[in-house]
Amino acid sequence: LDSEETFAWRMLSTLPFITLFMWWSGDLKHVTEIFRRVLQQPLLLLWLLISSFLCTTQLWLFLWGPINGRGLEVSLGYFLLPLVMVLVGCVLYKEKLSSWQMLAVALAVLGVGHEIWRIGSVAWETVYVALAYPLYFFLRRQFKTDNLGGFWWDLFLILPVAFYLGFVYSDSKALLLNYSHLIWAVLGLGFLSAL
């Protein structure tokens, strides 16, 4: 399976498991609460589509990078991400850091800065991971979808793309049928992703 097929099957198998988990934990109410809000404020659907795009492109990039030899660039974005989140917290939410936290941030800046210097450039994958997630989390907080229900909608709204990638774009369904152990791998991926 290539990165697009793996992404598709991950999305298709994660949603049922996360739905079961939310049902078991009593969190499905968040899904229906957001649905009621969409009925009252149809413009919220646009935000949910943007949220789904930001979230699922991150999930896709996480799979695409290593498969396509860009794992280091994607990983560097994940190392840079907490620093951007600290910056967002301090600037937008006026959070204060303790002396130990400032020391930790300074050491992280040194480590990540050294790696960027060693590589000699900042790839688009690094920038996307480091900036898109903070935007995603900020907007989810602003639109009050920062719960499992919001994530459920992110996955639900990407289903048409996942179905296309899994059933039209590729012949992966034939691969899954011919190698039945892959079905268990896909289900395991969905289960682990839902956790």
Where in the sequence are the language-model features?
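Hydrophobic transmembrane alpha-helices of multi-pass small-molecule transport proteins
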Residues: L97-I116, V129-L131, L159
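Membrane-interface helix caps and helix-loop-helix hairpins in membrane proteins
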Residues: W64-G69, K94, H114-W124, T145, ...
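Hydrophobic/aromatic residues within transmembrane alpha-helices
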Residues: T6, R10, G65-P66, V91-Y93, ...
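Transmembrane alpha-helices of multi-pass small-molecule transport proteins
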Residues: S3-L54, A132, W153-Y169
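C-terminal transmembrane-helix exit sites in multi-pass transporters
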Residues: L80-W100
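Hydrophobic/small/kink-forming positions within alpha-helical transmembrane segments
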Residues: T19, S52-W60, P82-L87, P134, ...
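Structural motif at transmembrane-helix junctions in multi-pass transporters
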Residues: D2-E5, W60-G77, L148
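Loop-to-transmembrane-helix transition segments
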Residues: H30-T57, W124-V129, K173-L195
